[in-house]
């Protein structure tokens, strides 16, 4: 039994590795990559807009919002409040400005494109969040359910969008520029962990509903895909054009 399982595991790894290499080769072509990028942006945008429509129409997600807010309020502990209050601090705009400024200063002379990507993603996502809050005007959870009192609108969550557009994107860029497999695993884990912790902290402290957090994640993800995908597409198209020009410039030796 064990030899069979081992053989199956090895064969599956080889198949996955082969498919991944073929996919990378296929995506070197700018046309398939453009289709993939456009599909991802449209899909995430549709998810966020659909979520916003459900919130406006009081669909089932609103019932889930209320149930989860009451359940978390009934199960809070002083230790939990202290932990998640510290975690949610990372998503405050003051902290985000400091982190973004430090990242830009560090990256500007090393990886300027990465610095610009973080600026555009963070700024763009916060503009969308501000417009969403002003447009939807959704009230925060009732004061009896909250630990932190906030007076601005609830949907979408600014902390959640920052957790993706700033922190997750930053860790992804570190993952992309690191050669060490161990560090790659660390950056990838943090890219998922930070949004999850910051998003859950907003729920635990009662300052946001679940749909607010999901909407904020979606906004941050859309901008992150945009700032990573568009430069990659430009690079692929430039490489393809250079390769085509090189082929055209070669003398025709066919007889």
Model region roles, listed by residue range:
Residues 49-50, 130-140, 197-208:
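C-terminal ends of transmembrane alpha-helices
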Residues 3-95, 134-148:
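N-terminal transmembrane-helix/juxtamembrane module of multi-pass inner/ER membrane proteins
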Residues 29-37, 85, 112, 178-188:
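Membrane-water interface of alpha-helical transmembrane segments
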Residues 56-57, 63, 98-100, 105-181, ...:
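Membrane-interface loops
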Residues 14-22, 145-255:
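Membrane-embedded catalytic cores of phosphoryl/pyrophosphoryl-handling enzymes
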Residues 41, 45, 49, 125-129, ...:
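Alpha-helical transmembrane segments of multipass membrane proteins
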Residues 35-36, 94-97, 115-120, 185-192, ...:
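Hydrophobic alpha-helical transmembrane segments
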